[in-house]
């Protein structure tokens, strides 16, 4: 399946505690159908110190969100949009914003 949301994209959270928040995608996990978004779904993790120099304590980190709860923000208009695909004349398959028809780079 082609990736509609990729690392570095700006997305809008559609549901959950962080509903309405925009953020940048830090990582995508295609097999789990989840993504990690900066500043969204932040959880506190209690960690023990380890020998490799890692300090213990309470660490805040972003947790994965299901891709169905995210919507890509169109880079041109700044509004959330659905994503489609189009094959260009040179044979490349590119992502396209459904709302504006603009090609999404990346």
Curated annotation (Swiss-Prot):
Q: How does it assemble?
A: Part of the 50S ribosomal subunit.
Q: Which GO terms describe its biological process?
A: translation
The record, for Pfam families, names: ribosomal_L24 (PF17136)
Give the record's keywords alphabetically: Ribonucleoprotein, Ribosomal protein, RNA-binding, rRNA-binding
According to its UniProt entry, the function of this protein is described as:
One of two assembly initiator proteins, it binds directly to the 5'-end of the 23S rRNA, where it nucleates assembly of the 50S subunit.
One GO molecular-function entry: structural constituent of ribosome
Question: Any one cellular component term from GO for this entry?
Answer: ribosome
Which named protein is this?
Answer: Large ribosomal subunit protein uL24
Give the family per the record. Answer: Belongs to the universal ribosomal protein uL24 family.
Bilayer-crossing residues are none
For the keyword Signal, the answer is no
- InterPro entries hit by this protein: KOW, Rib_uL2_dom2, Ribosomal_uL24, Ribosomal_uL24_CS, Ribosomal_uL24_KOW, Translation_prot_SH3-like_sf
List the SUPFAM superfamilies hit by this protein, alphabetically: Translation proteins SH3-like domain
């Amino acid at each position: 399946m082609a990736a509609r949301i990729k690392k570095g994209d700006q997305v809008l959270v559609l549901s959950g505690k962080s509903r309405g928040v925009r953020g940048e995608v830090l990582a995508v996990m295609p097999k789990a159908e989840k993504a990690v978004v900066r500043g969204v779904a932040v959880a506190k993790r209690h960690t023990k110190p380890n020998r490799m120099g890692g300090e213990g304590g309470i660490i805040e980190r972003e947790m994965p969100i299901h891709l169905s709860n995210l919507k890509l923000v169109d880079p041109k208009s700044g509004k959330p949009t659905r994503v489609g695909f189009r094959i260009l004349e040179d044979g490349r398959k590119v992502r396209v914003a459904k709302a504006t028809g603009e090609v999404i780079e990346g």
